[in-house]
Amino acid sequence: MKITEQRQGAVIVLKPDGALVDQDCALFRGRMVEAMGASLGRFVIDLSAVPFVDSRGLETLVELTEELGKSGQALRLCAANKTIREVLELTELTSLFEHFEDANTAVRSFL
C-alpha cells in the first residue's frame, strides 16, 4: 500500500492507495502515528483510492479515531466509495466517523 501525505494548513491529509486490509494495517497505523507526532492533531483520511476495507482495516480506523479523541485530536474520512459507506452503515460505525465528499470539504470542516 502506498500512502501519500499532504499538509493543508494545520491539517494532514493521508491518502492510502489500495485496500485497507489486514496485511497493510500495520503500515497504515505506523504512518498515522508518525504523522500524529508532527501535527496539530487534525487528520483527514482520503479514501478515494481505497476500493474496500476489511474488518482489521475498520478496527484500525476505530482505534485511531478513539486514540485521537482521547487527546483532543480529530480524524475525518472523505471520498469513501459506496461499498465502504455501506460497510460503515452495516457495522453501525457511521456515528463514529465524520465523512465528507472530498478532502477540501473535510479540511474546511476544521475551521
Spans of model-derived segments:
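Short beta-strand/loop segment at the start of cytosolic alpha/beta domains
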Residues: 1-15
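Short low-complexity stretches enriched in small and charged residues
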Residues: 1-4, 32-33, 107
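General small-molecule cofactor/ligand-binding pocket signal
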Residues: 4-6, 78, 100
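Residues that form or immediately flank small-molecule/cofactor binding pockets and catalytic motifs
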Residues: 8-10, 82, 104
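Active-site donor-binding loop signature of nucleotide-sugar glycosyltransferases
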Residues: 16-18, 102
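Amphipathic alpha-helical interaction surfaces in cytosolic regulatory modules
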Residues: 20-97
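A charged, well-structured terminal subsegment
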Residues: 98-111
